[in-house]
Amino acid sequence: MMEEQLIPIQWKDDALVLLDQTLLPNEIVYESFKTAESVWDAIQVMKVRGAPVIGVSAAYGVYLGVKEFAESTEEGFMDEVRKVCTYLATSRPTAVNLFWALERMESVAADNIHLSISQLKDRLLEEAKEIHREDEEINRQIGEHALTLFHDGMGVLTHCNAGALATTKYGTATAPMYLAKEKGWDLKIFSDETRPRLQGSTLTALELQRAGIDVTVITDNMAAMVMSQGKIDAVIVGCDRVAANGDIANKIGTLGVSILAKYYNIPFYVAAPTPTIDLKTPTGKEIPIEERDASEVINRFGQYSAPKESKVYNPAFDVTPHENVTAIITEKGIVKAPFTENLKKIFQ
């Protein structure tokens, strides 16, 4: 049974409206944000998460950060734009879309510095809305390309949430699932719960179920068994950054899934909007990996699952080497090895 689609991000009444994803699946709460500081906090505590929608949120955050700025000089306004962008960039270090969106907003301000301060503010809001619109179209295009690799009746495994909740619509890794549903195909989706924050079970399973898509939740350590039983024909994941050589940073646990897929000879696809591709970063070794609080691992639901004094290592992401990647699916087409050469081509 299909239910109303959850909308992760909206611009409404001169405010950024976000679906608080920390409360899902038990509560559906939308919250308004009217300052750059509140947007920073929403990104950092993961009320909003997923590289594409983080980028869109940050773009709106730039506008909110300068909206009330009273300085009348061009230099003063540009200094404030840079200050807000630098501040928002500290919210989460791994998602390259965040930095891409902030750089784009800063460039727009610099390119239009001849306008009045009021006009500049309007121009920044227009650009944030354009980034928002572009993401919707990018997601659909990724889905259309990915669908050429799928067929009716396939079993597909995904990890974490690269769905409509991580973007503005359709998602990246889930886009072909939504489009397959529109075509009347019956894909059987398996969603890793994705420890420690459980985005696969709380988010991916929630949104696919609401869309009427066949989805089964499994724990992360069940993936090997499900693959060995022949239930998985393809794996598709999103990513937070693609290095120039095709290494990908994605939610912790993705590396293990890629190793299993390679062992069982299952195609491993990565859905990646071009803003996620970072040609300035040579390999995955140079991608900064965010480490998060120990409580996410040992006190996830307000009750300790390990001794309170336990040492905890909690990286939010891992890096999958390009050798494990069958193809990277972008809005411009499907990229296969050699990635160093072919990733450059899509920007030409």
Curated annotation (Swiss-Prot):
The protein's name in its UniProt record: 5-deoxyribose 1-phosphate isomerase
Residue positions binding substrate: R49, G50, A51, R92, Q199, N250, K251
UniProt catalytic activity: 5-deoxy-alpha-D-ribose 1-phosphate = 5-deoxy-D-ribulose 1-phosphate; 5-(methylsulfanyl)-alpha-D-ribose 1-phosphate = 5-(methylsulfanyl)-D-ribulose 1-phosphate
Family, similarity comment: Belongs to the EIF-2B alpha/beta/delta subunits family. DrdI subfamily.
Keyword terms, alphabetized: Carbohydrate metabolism, Isomerase
Site (Transition state stabilizer): C160
Gene3D superfamilies in alphabetical order: translation initiation factor eif-2b, domain 1, Translation initiation factor eif-2b, domain 2
Record note on quaternary structure: Homodimer.
Catalytic site: D240 (proton donor)
Enzyme Commission code(s) on record: 5.3.1.-, 5.3.1.23
A GO molecular function held by the record: S-methyl-5-thioribose-1-phosphate isomerase activity
NCBIfam families in the cross-refs: eIF-2B_rel, PRK05720.1, salvage_mtnA
Gene for this chain: drdI
GO biological process, one term: toxic metabolite repair
Pathway entry: Carbohydrate degradation
Native organism taxonomy: Bacteria, Bacillati, Bacillota, Bacilli, Bacillales
Protein source organism: Bacillus thuringiensis serovar kurstaki (strain ATCC 35866 / NRRL B-4488 / HD73)
Deleted gene: phenotype: Cells lacking this gene show no impaired growth on minimal medium but addition of 5-deoxyribose inhibits growth at a higher level than wild-type. Moreover, the intracellular level of 5-deoxy-D-ribulose 1-phosphate increases in wild-type cells supplied with 5-deoxyribose, but not in the deletion mutant cells.
